């Protein structure tokens, strides 16, 4: 009976050999300790009992490769206890191992007469040991892991049909602590074959995350344990934050923390830090990519941290590596000198070439040259004074004083910037040579009392430092101290000394001396105070009287103290006055209109974002649904809940994944623009999210969406007053932008958003600046083509965008609103629109459009931009219309359907023509005179009722001719209405 069962097992094994001998490729996070299928030769496991229990059997696969299996089938005898033990298995540091068993098992119900003795399970045991040579099975040493049951068992029918029913069970055991272990299989009466046994442990395989390498890491002892592993930065990188990850029990890496950054000169590519390519550089250890060398610089090796400047170009010490290399400026232009006696005023113009820098300043070099040989010049010295200063001038003019008279001077004006010191070149300066005129002498520096008596004082003095010519005489002014110059006397002398006689004894006198040349008198000297005495004595020379000297010196000291005090007080008052003036000026400026700041002028665009937009924590934002797709990514609606404030609905613009630095900069530039605006008719920026992905712009939510779609959806539902109110709101927002010197460039109904209260707000501030800078982009911007139908002709032709071109676009928006979102110029091509505008055609009034509104549209569409109204005037006009609703009741047409012909402002006056022929000749369409006559249109009253179908019917098929005729018809109809008093003036 046992032999029959064995045959059944063998037959089954032959049927499954293909399934167990395929290529043995295991997951990367599993390390195999034992695989019975990979053992060459016999397994040689120990069985107990040695006979009649587990038996090793070899079968051949389809490649004639032997497969070693163990089987047992003692189902006829009760109380079976057959053991099979593996060889010693090293654990290699693993604390938890997994046992994968593949086996087949016979269904006991398919065996006759074995109901009491046949089993369908077997037991799995393990035993830890440091001894790898144990020869016997000691059952009491083993710890049971589990009882293994088959999910599927086979029958005699399966054997006949060669149906594979292979079971696979995996069990784990741990924690393990000894060097190795044994596994054991206990049979208690089953008919079973062990096809394969694999023992393995799990590890988290070597990986690189955030530029940090994490080594192979064996999982922890528990099924829920996490092993913290510190990573090491890859080559050419450094730690920003300590890189760590956790190895999970399933062999998967979890929760990366920290990261490494590529060193300067390297960027991340494919998880590695690779050197910047030639022509690129990276200055700092950041997560940025290598940047192309700035203008006028290059790199000739890989891994450059900065770029070398081209010859003749330099980089200042405080210039960032990202800044272009620059060069010194050229010389100032148009130097003009103006000599006034011994003063010179110099003025000049800025250099033609600033070297590419904004930090330009000017230095003045003064040289005094000999009259006989102008080439022999020497520096002027410290006696010359410059206003406001000699070096570092920010203005283009300077005043130079205290020069010598009748002297040749050469002045050099040097234009310098941050890199001038690297290449001082005479080409950076311009010079002028002047000769000073005659001038009064300078003041006398020192006056002394040589001798003092009861009735006289002997004075002596030095020549002025700058006589500025021949001294003709000196003038001495003196008076009694207590008279305070109310009564003084004058003495003149050609010498540098004089005796003043006839003085009163014991009286204090004050003396002043000045010199005169042919140019006039110089300034008086500082006052000298002397007191006469009763006893003759000499002040200077032999035996000076100590009392008189003390009085004189004391008086001088007191006078000096007084002068210093007066000077300090004067300076304080001057500083206060200046500070007060500056404060007043600052106050005045702050009360003025804010001016828009172009974020593209910032060297670091992120600085503009930080300055004008508020950073919002991403946790405060809840995205609810996608409401549209923009140029940079999806547009969603959601909610914003900032701590301390109520929750509000918001619109969320997201930046799509895989963006470039330029796309991120362009995306956030709109936030930098919106953040500067604060007006009820301008879309409000709530803030930005830049510190995590996705990058987002958060604005207020406008429930009714874009104005054009909203109007089309609600065609005919609003009163004229409501429509004018919408236009007034748009105009008010545009007036605010215009006052801030901001040009929108893309004003259209599609870029106006409407909230639940029908308040219209201007939006979409992302129009590209490339139009101004790139002559090749005549019709192309970053977002696509220029909106020809909304754009002023000078902006199309010359890329000249101004507030006046925005006014043109506003007129188109008015037409869109009054036509309930109809497409401007209908199905005409862009080229036809451009041609029609150039020829003077304009859009006709929409159906039921008040004449006053259409006239305002025509004003906005004046060809000369200076003839168009300002936004402030537009708002005032709309206010008048709203206050006078009767002015909105007269419309330009009584037609029951919209007019689709362009209006020609050059149509002739109705009063100037008397017949259909005259009219056609006036508009240069007299070729169609016979067509009109044949169709019965013989009077002007009949002509004003024709439409496009009528023209086609009488044989006028050219679209441009139809438009021209219908435009003139519309103008005549309007003139006829005016003649009959049907228009109400505003």
Curated annotation (Swiss-Prot):
Q: Where is the signal peptide?
A: 1-19
**Which amino acid positions bind ATP, per UniProt?**
627-635, 653
Active site per the UniProt annotation: 746
Q: Kindly give the membrane topology term recorded for this protein.
A: Single-pass type I membrane protein
Reply yes or no: does the keyword Phosphoprotein apply: yes
Q: Which reaction does it catalyse?
A: L-tyrosyl-[protein] + ATP = O-phospho-L-tyrosyl-[protein] + ADP + H(+)
* Effect listed in the UniProt record for changing residue 42 to A: 10-fold reduced affinity for EFNB2
Q: Name one Pfam family in it.
A: Ephrin_rec_like
Q: What class of enzyme is it?
A: transferase
Name of the protein in question: Ephrin type-A receptor 4
Q: List all topological domains (Extracellular).
A: 20-547
- The Protein kinase domain covers 621-882
Q: Does the keyword ATP-binding apply?
A: yes
Q: Where are the transmembrane segments?
A: 548-569
- Broad class of where this protein is predominantly found: membrane
**Family assignment from sequence similarity:** Belongs to the protein kinase superfamily. Tyr protein kinase family. Ephrin receptor subfamily.
What does the UniProt entry say about where the protein is found? Cell membrane; Cell projection, Axon; Cell projection, Dendrite; Postsynaptic density membrane
Can you state the subunit structure given in the record? Heterotetramer upon binding of the ligand. The heterotetramer is composed of an ephrin dimer and a receptor dimer. Oligomerization is probably required to induce biological responses. Interacts (phosphorylated at position Tyr-602) with FYN. Interacts with CDK5, CDK5R1 and NGEF; upon activation by EFNA1 induces NGEF phosphorylation by the kinase CDK5. Interacts with CHN1; effector of EPHA4 in axon guidance linking EPHA4 activation to RAC1 regulation.
Entry-linked InterPro entries: Eph_TM, EphA4_rcpt_lig-bd, EphA4_SAM, Ephrin_rcpt_lig-bd_dom, Ephrin_rcpt_TKs, FN3_dom, FN3_sf, Galactose-bd-like_sf
Q: What is the lineage of its organism?
A: Eukaryota, Metazoa, Chordata, Craniata, Vertebrata
Where along the sequence does the record place the motif called PDZ-binding? 984-986
């Amino acid at each position: 009976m046992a032999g029959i069962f064995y045959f059944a097992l063998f037959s089954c094994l032959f049927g499954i050999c293909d399934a167990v001998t395929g290529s043995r490729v295991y997951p990367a996070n599993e390390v195999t300790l034992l695989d019975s299928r990979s053992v060459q030769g016999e397994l040689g496991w120990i069985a107990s009992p040695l006979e009649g229990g587990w038996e090793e059997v070899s079968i051949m696969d389809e490649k004639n490769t032997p497969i070693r299996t163990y089987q047992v089938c003692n189902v006829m005898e009760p109380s079976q206890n057959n053991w099979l033990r593996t060889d010693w298995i090293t654990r290699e540091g693993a604390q938890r191992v997994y046992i994968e068993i593949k086996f087949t098992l016979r269904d006991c119900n398919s065996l006759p007469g074995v109901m009491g003795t046949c089993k369908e399970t077997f037991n799995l045991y393990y035993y830890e040991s440091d001894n790898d040579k144990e020869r016997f099975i000691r059952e009491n040493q083993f710890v049971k892991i589990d009882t293994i049951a088959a999910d599927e068992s086979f029958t005699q029918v399966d054997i006949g049909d060669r149906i594979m029913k292979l079971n696979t069970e995996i069990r784990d055991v741990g924690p393990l602590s000894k060097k190795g272990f044994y596994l054991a299989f206990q049979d208690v009466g089953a008919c079973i074959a062990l096809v394969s046994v694999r023992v393995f442990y799990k590890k988290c395989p070597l990986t690189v995350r955030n530029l940090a390498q994490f080594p192979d890491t064996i999982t922890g002892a528990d099924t829920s344990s996490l092993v913290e592993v510190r990573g090491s930065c890859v080559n050419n990188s450094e730690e920003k934050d300590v890189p760590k990850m956790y190895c999970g029990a399933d062999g998967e890496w979890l929760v990366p923390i920290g990261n490494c950054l590529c060193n300067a000169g390297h960027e991340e590519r494919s998880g590695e830090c690779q050197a910047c390519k030639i022509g690129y550089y990276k200055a700092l250890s950041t997560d940025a990519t290598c940047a192309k060398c700035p203008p006028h610089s290059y790199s000739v090796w890989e891994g450059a941290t900065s770029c070398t400047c081209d010859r003749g170009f330099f980089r200042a010490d405080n210039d960032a590596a990202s800044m272009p290399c620059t060069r010194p400026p050229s010389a100032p232009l148009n130097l003009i000198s103006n000599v006034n006696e011994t003063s010179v005023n110099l003025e000049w113009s800025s250099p033609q070439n600033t070297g590419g820098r904004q930090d330009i300043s000017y230095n003045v070099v003064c040289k005094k040259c000999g009259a006989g040989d102008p080439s022999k010049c020497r520096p002027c010295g410290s006696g010359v004074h410059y206003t406001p200063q000699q070096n570092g001038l920010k203005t283009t003019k300077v005043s130079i004083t205290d020069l010598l008279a009748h002297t040749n001077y050469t002045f050099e004006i040097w234009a310098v910037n941050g890199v001038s010191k690297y290449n001082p070149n005479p080409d950076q300066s311009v010079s002028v040579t002047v000769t000073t005129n005659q001038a009064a002498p300078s003041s006398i520096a020192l006056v002394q009392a040589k001798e003092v008596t009861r009735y006289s004082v002997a004075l002596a003095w030095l020549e002025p430092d700058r006589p500025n010519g021949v001294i003709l005489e000196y003038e001495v002014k003196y008076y009694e101290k207590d008279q305070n110059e109310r009564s003084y006397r004058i003495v003149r002398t050609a010498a540098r000394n004089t005796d003043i006689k006839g003085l009163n004894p014991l009286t204090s006198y004050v003396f002043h001396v000045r010199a005169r040349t042919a140019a006039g008198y110089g300034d008086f000297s500082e006052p000298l105070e002397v007191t006469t005495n009763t006893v003759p004595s000499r002040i200077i020379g032999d035996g000076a009287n100590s009392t008189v000297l003390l009085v004189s010196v004391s008086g001088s000291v007191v006078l000096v103290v007084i002068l210093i005090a007066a000077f300090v007080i004067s300076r304080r008052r001057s500083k206060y006055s200046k500070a007060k003036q500056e404060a007043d000026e600052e106050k005045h400026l702050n009360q003025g209109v804010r001016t828009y700041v172009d974020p593209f002028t910032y060297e670091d665009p992120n600085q503009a974002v930080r300055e004008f937009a508020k950073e919002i924590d991403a946790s405060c934002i809840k995205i609810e649904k996608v409401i549209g797709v923009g140029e940079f990514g999806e547009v969603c609606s959601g909610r914003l809940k900032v701590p301390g404030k109520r929750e509000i609905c918001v619109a969320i613009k997201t930046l799509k994944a895989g963006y470039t630095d330029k796309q991120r900069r362009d995306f956030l530039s709109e936030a930098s623009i919106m953040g500067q605006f604060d007006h009820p008719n301008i879309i409000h920026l709530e803030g930005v999210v830049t510190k995590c992905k996705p990058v987002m712009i958060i604005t207020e939510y406008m429930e009714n969406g874009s104005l054009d779609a909203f109007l089309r959806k609600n065609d005919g539902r609003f009163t004229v007053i409501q429509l004018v109110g919408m236009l007034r709101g748009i105009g008010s927002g545009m007036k605010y932008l215009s006052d801030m010197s901001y040009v929108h460039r893309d004003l259209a109904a599609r870029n106006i958003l409407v909230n639940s209260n029908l308040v219209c707000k201007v939006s979409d501030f992302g129009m590209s600046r490339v139009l101004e800078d790139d002559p090749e982009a005549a019709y192309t911007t970053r977002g696509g083509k220029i909106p020809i139908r909304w754009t002023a002709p000078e902006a199309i032709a010359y890329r000249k965008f101004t507030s006046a071109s925005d006014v043109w676009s506003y007129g188109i928006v008015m037409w869109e609103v009054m036509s309930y979102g109809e497409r401007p110029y209908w199905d005409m091509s862009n080229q036809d629109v451009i041609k029609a505008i150039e020829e003077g055609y304009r859009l006709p009034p929409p159906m039921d459009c008040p004449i006053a509104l259409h006239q305002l549209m025509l004003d906005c569409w004046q060809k000369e931009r200076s003839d168009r109204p300002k936004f402030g005037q537009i708002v005032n006009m709309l206010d008048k219309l709203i206050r006078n609703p009767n002015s909105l009741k007269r419309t330009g047409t009584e037609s029951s359907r919209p007019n689709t012909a362009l209006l020609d402002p050059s149509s002739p006056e109705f009063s100037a023509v008397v017949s259909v022929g005259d009219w056609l000749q006036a508009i240069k369409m007299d070729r169609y005179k016979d067509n009109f006559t044949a169709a019965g249109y013989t009077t002007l009253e009949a002509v004003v009722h024709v439409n496009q179908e009528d023209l086609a019917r009488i044989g006028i098929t050219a679209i441009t001719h139809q438009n021209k005729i219908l435009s003139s018809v519309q103008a005549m109809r309007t003139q006829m209405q005016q003649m009959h008093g049907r228009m109400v003036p505003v």
